[in-house]
Amino acid sequence: MIATIVTSVSIIFVVLGALISAFAATGLIRLRDVYSRAHAAGKAATLGAMFLLFGAFLYFIGTEGYVNMQLIIGIIFVFITGPLSSHLIMKAAYNIKTPYTKDTKIDEIKEDMKHTKL
């Protein structure tokens, strides 16, 4: 009984992760500039991958009865590297003066960069 519930919850997490990853892929295709694309990749793809890994983690607990440490390490790795990589991509794009879209109104980074030494 409990194995069926855990398996059902793990399937829900895997499906949610796949849907969020599909939304992230759509954002990468449809968004206009590198800043928006990096934001979509950093936020949505990271959350989607974490849901997929957590669903697999729950599945192994429910069906096999053991904790898979590789999945825990994978979740932690994705949690750290996803937002960090998108931040570095946006910072590099800003430093080489990649243009914004026409819809961008305010450059908040310029004020922050005045007080930062590179």
Swiss-Prot record:
<dbReference type="InterPro" id="IPR005133">
    <property type="entry name" value="PhaG_MnhG_YufB"/>
</dbReference>
<dbReference type="GO" id="GO:0005886">
    <property type="term" value="C:plasma membrane"/>
</dbReference>
<keyword id="KW-0375">Hydrogen ion transport</keyword>
<keyword id="KW-0050">Antiport</keyword>
<comment type="subunit">
    <text>May form a heterooligomeric complex that consists of seven subunits: mnhA1, mnhB1, mnhC1, mnhD1, mnhE1, mnhF1 and mnhG1.</text>
</comment>
<comment type="function">
    <text>Mnh complex is a Na(+)/H(+) antiporter involved in Na(+) excretion.</text>
</comment>
<keyword id="KW-0915">Sodium</keyword>
<feature type="transmembrane region" description="Helical">
    <location>
        <begin position="47"/>
        <end position="67"/>
    </location>
</feature>
<keyword id="KW-0739">Sodium transport</keyword>
<feature type="transmembrane region" description="Helical">
    <location>
        <begin position="69"/>
        <end position="89"/>
    </location>
</feature>
<keyword id="KW-1133">Transmembrane helix</keyword>
<feature type="transmembrane region" description="Helical">
    <location>
        <begin position="9"/>
        <end position="29"/>
    </location>
</feature>
<protein>
    <recommendedName>
        <fullName>Na(+)/H(+) antiporter subunit G1</fullName>
    </recommendedName>
</protein>
<keyword id="KW-0406">Ion transport</keyword>
<dbReference type="Pfam" id="PF03334">
    <property type="entry name" value="PhaG_MnhG_YufB"/>
</dbReference>
<keyword id="KW-0472">Membrane</keyword>
<comment type="similarity">
    <text>Belongs to the CPA3 antiporters (TC 2.A.63) subunit G family.</text>
</comment>
<keyword id="KW-0813">Transport</keyword>
<keyword id="KW-1003">Cell membrane</keyword>
<keyword id="KW-0812">Transmembrane</keyword>
<dbReference type="GO" id="GO:0015385">
    <property type="term" value="F:sodium:proton antiporter activity"/>
</dbReference>
